[in-house]
Amino acid sequence: MSKQAIRLTQYSHGAGCGCKISPKVLETILHSEQAKFVDPNLLVGNETRDDAAVYDLGNGTSIISTTDFFMPIVDNPFDFGRIAATNAISDIFAMGGKPIMAIAILGWPINTLSPDIAREVTEGGRFACRQAGIALAGGHSIDAPEPIFGLAVTGVVPTERVKKNSTAQAGCKLFLTKPLGIGVLTTAEKKSLLKPEHQGLATEVMCRMNVAGAAFANIDGVKAMTDVTGFGLLGHLSEMCQGAGVQAMLCYQDIPKLPGVEEYIALGAVPGGTERNFASYGHLMGDMSREVRSLLCDPQTSGGLLLAVTPDAEDDVKATAAEFGIELTAIGELVEARGGRAMVEIR
């Protein structure tokens, strides 16, 4: 089979971050008394489902460690590798850090797909690493029934600048650096519903580095930060709210969306991960239409940064975003938690 005829997405049952195990099932897997390990230098572990682990070296610098890998979300091998690597590196930026090194994770059906295609995937990953200014320094590979690619990434951050997903405050404005709808558009493409003018839009967004995260971390008024990936905006925002004991009020019209996303939702281009996310987080939502629900629960692959920002730092955040070519609009705010109100409400 020629490389041009290969459709990588046909060789896997899941796609991108949409193939994550659902939060409900993951809770069952991770629930263990042995998971509790006390180390005063471990600043961020698994307790708040943050983007990466952070370890204090005791000299003013902390190490960030993360891993992320998934099955193809696009058919082009190079783009698949680039997206997977960009997505993995994003976790370092989401913690406010700077990546310093990556190693590759590759699972490949060697009797089904040519090693040449795997090389293209790896080259895409290497390209993303070069964009981030780091080496793809090694890795590990296995013969697997479905193609899988990703990275384990190491980063560094000044300890006082670590940005967690659990330290937001009531009164903070919420900002999102990329539009939602990646899961919808990639599903529309798999179903041959995607219009010519929307071809490549999702890939362009997924390949966009969240490098601004390290700059946002230098702003004192950025109280919390995370990236929006497989659990959708609802899932990652809920984790931010739960960790800080606050509630979120979102303005649907202000949430950035990829062109055509509402039309494709109406046509049924909704990935399976959306329903899994709703099953895990839907009870935290206020009343909303199926269309709104489908967007907020849409699994993002290499999605944007979600920031909780104090009002006095809003101008600094917008100016920093502009330096990186990001146009920011507040999508909502955090308020004091009150009983009888949903954790995430839409207006």
Curated annotation (Swiss-Prot):
Site (Important for catalytic activity): 20
Annotated active site: 17
Disulfide-linked positions: none
Pfam families registered for this protein in UniProt: AIRS, AIRS_C
GO biological process assignments: selenocysteine biosynthetic process
GO cellular component term, pick one: cytoplasm
Class of enzymatic activity (EC top level): transferase
Keywords: ATP-binding, Kinase, Magnesium, Metal-binding, Nucleotide-binding, Selenium, Transferase
Binding site for ATP: 20, 48-50, 68, 91, 139-141
Keyword set includes Magnesium: yes
Residues where Mg(2+) binds: 51, 91, 227
Listed cofactors: Mg(2+)
UniProt GO molecular function: ATP binding; magnesium ion binding; selenide, water dikinase activity
Assembly description: Homodimer.
Record-linked HAMAP family: SelD
Similarity section: Belongs to the selenophosphate synthase 1 family. Class I subfamily.
Alphabetical list of PANTHER family matching this protein: INACTIVE SELENIDE, WATER DIKINASE-LIKE PROTEIN-RELATED, SELENIDE, WATER DIKINASE
Protein name: Selenide, water dikinase
Natural source organism: Salmonella typhi
Gene encoding the protein: selD
